[in-house]
């Protein structure tokens, strides 16, 4: 019989630890998060409020320089609520052509009959002349209800929009009386890249969404922040979409 080979294949347990680079959505909660979740004061967010959820909403709103916040299960829902709160059937949302809200989400178009108008851009930044041309006035059959921007920009390889671009988009929209929504799922990445506070980016939008379960490594959740009347409207819409949660403070605590 042939002699057995002396070579062996190393056991998987002996291999060097691997790092999962597929997405920042695979991040795991820290031990401090687990501990805070275990100790979180809780209530019923659908009845008279959950204290940990209320604390998170206020903390994020203050961090972004906004009046109020709303905790929701995902940033997709936060973006959807921003769209629904801003407009209605047969109105238009204008956004960059490769934006996550346009390429992946598009929930408002399905649920409300709103139209998403893409504008060509470079590295996630809309061409400003094309943006201006895309805006439709009130009374038009496709009146523009909202302009949306995204930073950092997922489909542009994580590109961070310059502050002067955000300021220019805001100025164009304001001249037409149109609110701006910032899809800030990765806003804190942009904040770190630009070396500015999150509020210095959020100030160029009426409403802002931030995700807790990506780079921040919380297990679930997002916050929509903006003016009090808009967030009150979004809270009602959240219930209609089935997004109201009960002892949500267990999850919200990880974001604190």
Task: Annotate each PLM feature.
Residues 2-256:
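Conserved PLP-enzyme active-site core in the AAT-like
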């Amino acid at each position: 019989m042939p002699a057995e080979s002396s070579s062996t294949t190393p056991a998987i347990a002996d291999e060097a630890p691997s790092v999962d680079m597929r997405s920042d959505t695979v991040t795991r909660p820290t031990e401090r998060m687990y501990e805070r979740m275990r100790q979180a004061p809780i209530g019923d967010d659908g009845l008279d409020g959950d204290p940990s959820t209320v604390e998170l909403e206020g903390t994020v709103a203050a961090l972004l320089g906004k009046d109020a916040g709303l905790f929701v299960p995902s940033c997709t829902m936060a973006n959807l609520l921003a769209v629904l709160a801003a407009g209605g059937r047969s109105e238009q949302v204008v956004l960059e052509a490769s934006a996550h809200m346009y390429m992946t989400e598009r929930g408002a178009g399905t649920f409300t009959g709103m139209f998403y108008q893409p504008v060509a851009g470079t590295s996630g930044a809309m061409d400003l002349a094309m943006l201006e041309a895309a805006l439709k006035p009130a009374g038009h059959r496709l009146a523009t209800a909202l302009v949306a921007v995204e930073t950092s920009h997922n489909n542009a390889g994580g590109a961070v929009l310059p502050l002067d671009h955000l300021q220019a988009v805001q100025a164009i929209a304001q001249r037409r009386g149109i609110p701006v929504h910032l899809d800030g799922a990765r806003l804190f990445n942009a904040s770190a890249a630009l070396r500015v506070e999150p509020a210095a980016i959020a100030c160029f939008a009426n409403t802002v969404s931030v995700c807790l379960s990506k780079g921040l490594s919380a297990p679930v959740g997002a916050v929509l922040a903006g003016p009090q009347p808009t967030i009150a409207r979004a809270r009602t819409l959240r219930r209609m979409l089935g997004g109201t949660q009960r002892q949500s403070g267990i999850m919200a605590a990880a974001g604190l």
